[in-house]
Amino acid sequence: TTVDQTVQMLKAMKVAGFAPKVVDLAQQYYDPALASSGVAEGAYVLTNTQPFEEPNAAIDLYNQWLKKAGGGTAPTTLGVESFSAGLLFAKVAGSLGSHLTRDNLITGLTKVTSWDAGGLHPSQNPGQNIANSCVLYLQVKGGKFVRAFPDKGFSCNTANTAHVSGDFGKVPVEK
């Protein structure tokens, strides 16, 4: 669902008198439109990037580029992840110089086993397709996002994740 759809759902819940103890939302809801909606007070939002509300040089750089390219677009976690991917591409492509080919780029990307995009997010291992187990929760208070957990940094305990085995990429085709 989109942020707008979720805001509409939260409005409908309020009208119906339904007030759950916890509203726990995923990272795509780290969007000023949710916080300023007037119906998300107290909602928790998971993120795996540095909060926009806290000082961070890498987030400042993202915001500078967003301002140049975005035409007034608000920063979002998904935007930060896209920016990180672009930085990773630029780093590896730049290191190849005149040897930039598709195969060399893929080989170069598989060699990157620690990537934090200069501090945009906790380090992860894109070369081996291994995400980190780090989380950070924000909470909507007074129409703004504030840090809820942990007090600083990220919680990077492996207990934050669960291993699920199986091939979830194949959808059976009905005949």
Language model features by range: what are they?
Residues 2-9, 55-62, 82-85, 92, ...:
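Stable alpha-helical elements in mature extracytoplasmic
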Residues 8, 29, 121-123:
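Residue-level detector of functional hotspots within protein domains
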Residues 68-79, 90-149:
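Segments of small-molecule ligand-sensing domains
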Residues 133-135, 155-159:
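Sequence contexts marking disulfide-bonded cysteines in secreted/extracellular proteins
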